[in-house]
C-alpha cells in the first residue's frame, strides 16, 4: 500500500510534468492525498486527466461567478479549483453556484473541501447522481462511491450552507435539564465524601 507521502509527492511531480507551476503542483499533491485519505478515487482521476491533457485542451476558469459556463472547451478542474480556493471569501456570500462542462469533477472536490474550512461553512456539491457534503475539511460525505473515473460533469451545482444546529430548541432544553441533575444540594455527609461540588469548586 502506498503511503500518503508517496501519493502527495508523486502527484505533485506529475502535475509539474503536466505543465502546472510548482505552486499549483503543491496544491494538487495535497488534494490527491486528501481524496485518497477519504477513500475517494484521486489517483485514478488525476492520472486519466493528465493522459487526456496530452491530446485535449481545457479552458482555465480564473474568475468564479455564480454561473460559470463554457460552451466550447471543458473547464480544467485544477485551475477552477485554485480560483475557487483563492476567492473563498468572496464566494461565501453566494448561496448557489453553477458550473457547466467541468472536466474530472472529483479533482475539483478537495479545493471545495479546503474552502469550506476557510469559510467556516459546509459546502454541498452535486452533479448527475453524485452528491457530496464537504464538512470544514474534516470529512467528505458521499451518497455513493463507485471508485470510478468521472471525466465530465455537464452541470455541477455548489451550495454554500448556513451553519445550523442539528437539533431543535426542545431537544436542547431537555439535554440542558439533564445536565442540571449533576448539581445536587450539599449535605454534611456529602461534603465529607466530596460529592456535590459545583463546577466552580476548586478544593
Language-model features and meaning:
Residues 1, 19-20, 39, 120, ...:
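Glycine-centered secondary-structure boundary/capping sites
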Residues 4, 26, 32, 81-88, ...:
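Aromatic-enriched hydrophobic runs in primary sequence
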Residues 43, 48-139:
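A glycine-rich, acidic short-motif signal
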Amino acid at each position: 500500500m502506498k503511503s500518503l507521502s508517496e501519493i502527495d509527492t508523486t502527484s505533485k511531480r506529475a502535475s509539474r510534468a503536466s505543465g502546472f507551476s510548482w505552486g499549483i503542483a503543491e496544491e494538487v499533491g495535497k488534494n490527491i492525498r486528501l481524496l485518497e485519505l477519504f477513500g475517494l478515487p484521486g489517483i485514478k482521476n488525476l492520472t486519466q486527466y493528465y493522459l487526456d491533457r496530452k491530446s485535449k485542451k481545457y479552458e482555465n476558469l480564473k474568475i468564479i461567478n455564480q454561473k460559470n459556463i463554457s460552451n466550447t472547451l471543458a473547464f480544467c478542474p485544477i485551475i477552477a479549483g485554485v480560483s475557487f480556493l483563492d476567492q473563498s471569501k468572496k464566494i461565501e456570500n453566494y448561496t448557489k453556484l453553477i458550473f457547466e462542462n467541468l472536466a474530472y469533477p472529483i479533482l475539483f472536490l478537495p479545493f471545495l473541501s479546503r474552502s469550506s474550512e476557510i469559510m467556516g461553512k459546509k459546502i454541498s456539491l452535486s452533479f448527475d447522481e453524485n452528491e457530496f457534503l464537504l464538512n470544514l475539511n474534516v470529512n467528505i460525505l458521499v451518497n455513493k462511491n463507485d471508485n470510478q473515473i468521472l471525466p465530465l460533469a455537464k452541470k455541477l451545482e455548489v451550495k454554500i450552507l448556513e451553519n445550523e444546529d442539528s437539533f431543535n430548541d426542545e431537544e436542547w432544553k431537555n439535554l440542558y435539564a439533564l445536565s442540571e441533575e449533576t448539581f445536587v444540594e450539599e449535605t454534611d455527609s456529602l461534603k465529607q465524601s466530596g460529592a456535590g461540588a459545583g463546577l466552580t469548586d476548586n478544593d
